[in-house]
Amino acid sequence: MRKLPLFMAWKFWLICLYIIKVASTQIVIKSNTIVGGNNPSGFQNGYIVSGDAFLAFQDMNTVPMYQTVRIDKGGALYYINNDKQGFSILSDHNYNHPFVFLNEGTVVVDDRRSISPGSWTIKDGSFTNNGNIMFTSSQGDIFSIGSNYITNTGFIFSKGTSFEKPQRLQIGNGNIWINTGTVCMANTTYILENAIQGGGCISVGENSVFNIYSFDMQQQTVYLSHPSSVLILNGGHEVPVYGLGNGNGILYPDAPIRDIYYDSSTGIMDVTAGTNGIYKFTVYIGAGYNESNFEIVSSIKIHGISYDNYNFVRYRGPPPNLAPSVCQPCVEIPLYSFQVPDPYTTTNELGFSETVSFYSTYNENDIPVIGNTTIYVPPAIYTLTKVNENTTETDIISRVTGMGYNGLPFTYYTTITVGEMETGVVTKTITITENKSRSTKTTLMSRNYTFSFSNYSPISSSGTYSVSTVDNITTLTDTVANVSSSGPNSIVTATMTTYQNNHEFNNASVINVTNSSNIMVPITSTFYSSVDSNLTTPITSLTRTSQSQIVSHITKLASSINETTIANTFPSPAASGTNYTTVVTNAEGSVQTDIVSHITTTDSDGKPTTIVSHITTTDSDGKPTTIVTTFPAPAASGADYTTVVTNADGSVETDIVSHITTKDSIGKPTTVVTTVPYTLCASNADYTTVVTKSNVSVETEVVSHITTTAPCSDLESHVENQTTSPSMHTTSLVGSENGVSAKTVNDKPNPTIFTEVAVSEGTTSNAGYVTDQGSSLEMFAPTGASAVESGNKVSQTQTASIFHGAGSTFKIKFNTILLSTSLTILILLGMA
């Protein structure tokens, strides 16, 4: 055996040692590692990322990619450029050891935040991808895999983010490469350099172009997944293409397309181009297409290049077939997973606690980042009391926090001073003006003295206590009444709180109104009793008592077409609880004395309350309005009295005004003033009258009388019967309320009929609003009765058939008569 020369032997061993050294110096990443800056040390000989770990090169535009780059299954490798020049990353190796790139895990090459185009290149060696790889950029980078041996069984996604600057994908160096996985494209141009073997998929997505020239693509599936996808052909072999439709298509750049032939039975489309159709290519697109929807486009611009010679064919309808199963969905690969810190709580410089929590998200460049949220927890509202030799002042202090326009937190303090209150307000008017977008609250007040107090607390846990300031006047509102159940445009009476030290400080009540959006809005108003203007000594000790005041309102349409609501306060009744009178000058100049009546009752909480009657009607503009009802004052003795009334037709009649004491629907006492025409009954004799019928016939009718109890000379009831024939007549009960029910009781054998008419509770019909209601009374009688309307616009008609004979009696009993409606009853009863 021939021995090697000594020099040659040493050379051989040196080469072996060098190879061993190169292999042994590659760094192995076994835990999550983030490296910043260009060309970090320790990675110049290659790197291997173990499973369940990642290696991230950040804030750089160039790093080594030497000899061997391997990512094990479960591992990940990230190249991330943050605000640098575009990537300049190139593979390299020693002269006798080819470069190896092997990915079993995840690789992301992210140049989206670069400020110029870059490149990531494998120039030779071998490239094997059995995992997931994403190339992404914003400036039109070139991602090139020029290895001698290329195999892809996994997923490769070339995703540009700019429509104007699509990136370029290059795979292959002229050699055949194998694809059994999926290659996805978005905002990408991919120019094929040789045929692709294997049964894989090329998915051409948004604003992407796949140029296959004339290479054999029969083993691959091309999927046009977006309406802007383009496939470029130069003739040659048959190509399977899926997803043709919605405007995407096929470009033949070398000659104008002449004809399209589609065979629905085979799913094959033949395209001829050039003079006399000398060029031809065949595309398998599948069954289900409509040949009339194919279109040859005369001019189109693709990735900045114009094609103006009928070079593009497209299908206007949707693709009839689903995506092929061999093509994986084109889903973006996220960057390395963030370790989101746990939340924590701290105390800031303002003295209140902050809770800081973290989350992972993407920024405006689709880069994952960690964000944080800070929740500010200010202390509870507290009270500070200041005392000197003259006054005691209580301050309510709260803190408000927020975020300023610069994103920084701010805090300010609010202080409400309860002290040196101005009272003695004689009148207060609240006006709410709606203009469909905002409301304005105007308060008019007059004042005449001040006082201060301390140690205030609400008088009722069921009420609402609030402190508000208007026109520099602090108002304490302590409302016991429950207004939430009250309807819109309603008057709500409440038991108020009186603070007393020989003088009064009264809270008023709450009004519910509806704004322009038909939303019920409660208005809380404060009213003060008149007090001694000479009072100068501060009141520091107050005694609580209860008193009621009444608030009503008028809603009208103002000249500016805005709804205006005016709140009015009416004084409480006199201490004796009696009605009081007021002098009113009418529009025509006459003067009359009116009585204002009231009802003293209790509210739902058992508190005493006083109600002044009111009428809801409409004003001249057709808007709802509420007015206070007054009645002419009775004689000083309180007895019934008569008054002379001039009717609209000029006739004069004498009316009797009397009072009825009864109970309302909830059993509370109520007083009703009734007005009945005064009829002289000197003789009580029957008389005749001439009646002209609607058919112009004239007849004479007999008017007879029955004496019971009615307002005559002896205050007896006078019931008239007008008889023409034993037919049905109509009875009108004028001035009654809704809903009348009747029952007939036969309590005597020869028939004495007792009919009880019960007025059921309903919505009050008020003056100025006309309501006609009717119901039928089936009374035991062959003859009828009729009545006329008198003295009121509100009428209710009862139809009755009444049987009566000798000794029969007819009686009407009203179980319930509601407040503030003058009642005139005139019954015409026919007697047999």
Swiss-Prot record:
GO cellular component terms given for this protein: extracellular region; fungal-type cell wall
Subcellular location: Secreted, Cell wall
Induction: Induced during biofilm formation on catheters inside the host. May be repressed during biofilm formation ex vivo.
GO molecular function: cell adhesion mediator activity
Pfam families assigned: Hpf1_C (PF20646), Hyphal_reg_CWP (PF11765)
Glycosites: 187, 290, 372, 390, 435, 448, 472, 482, 507, 512, 515, 534, 562, 579, 695, 721
Region Disordered, annotated ranges: 722-747
GO biological process: cell adhesion involved in biofilm formation; cell-cell adhesion
Role noted for this protein: Mediates cell-substrate adhesion and promotes biofilm formation.
Protein name: Adhesin AWP2
Source organism (scientific name): Candida glabrata (strain ATCC 2001 / BCRC 20586 / JCM 3761 / NBRC 0622 / NRRL Y-65 / CBS 138)
Gene: AWP2
